[in-house]
Amino acid sequence: TSECVGEIIMKIACIIPSRYASTRLPGKPLRMIAGQTLIHRVYNRAILAKSPDIVVVATDYRAIAEEVEGFGGRVVMTAVNHPTGTDRLAEVAEQLADYDIIVNVQGDEPFIDPDVIDRLAKMLTEHENLDMVTAAAPLKKEEYQDASAVKVVVNQKGEALYFSRALIPYPREGFAMPPLKHIGVYAYRRSFL
């Protein structure tokens, strides 16, 4: 549902970029996980969030679009030449001119917490000085050297300083915060994209 800020109602869209031609695992969105495709599971988690007025899958692959339509989801076909998921997101955001906030949920996050979507959208509705926000969580010990876990270092205000798949050294004692694990969810003001 839309967020009301003062007298202004902000409309929120959740977009799930999904492409078939993954480098590490081609066809990943259509892979079955306990009887449902990956993209279906991600969509089902996203629609549990309370803040989005609309949830849309953005894809350049017809079979993914057909899968989404088959389970009753919304889908927008995009160009095939986008270098990143954010570029695909921006293409769809241009078509959603009535929406103020765009939440980007990665198409390979079947366990995304819907509350994270809501919290990121709320950050932008409550802080007009922010154009983009993302999420992070404590890094588990076994993830420190895992290249698939994106680490993020933040300053004392919680602002990201840098991201890395490599091990990030930090002092065990002192003021430095240990690295966090980046969660692949972003929220943007549509005008920022």
Predicted stretch roles:
Residues 52, 98-99, 127-130:
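Short, high-confidence coil segments that cap the C-terminus of an alpha-helix
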Residues 11-59:
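N-terminal glycine-rich phosphate-binding loop and ensuing alpha1 helix
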Residues 112-193:
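Conserved core of the sugar-phosphate nucleotidyltransferase
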Residues 56, 62-122:
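Short phosphate-binding loop-to-helix
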Residues 14, 55-57, 102, 132, ...:
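Hydrophobic/aromatic residues located in beta-strands of well-ordered beta-sheets
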Residues 1-9:
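Short, Lys/Arg-enriched N-terminal segments with co-localized hydrophobic residues
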Residues 17, 104-106, 135-136:
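Short beta-strand segments
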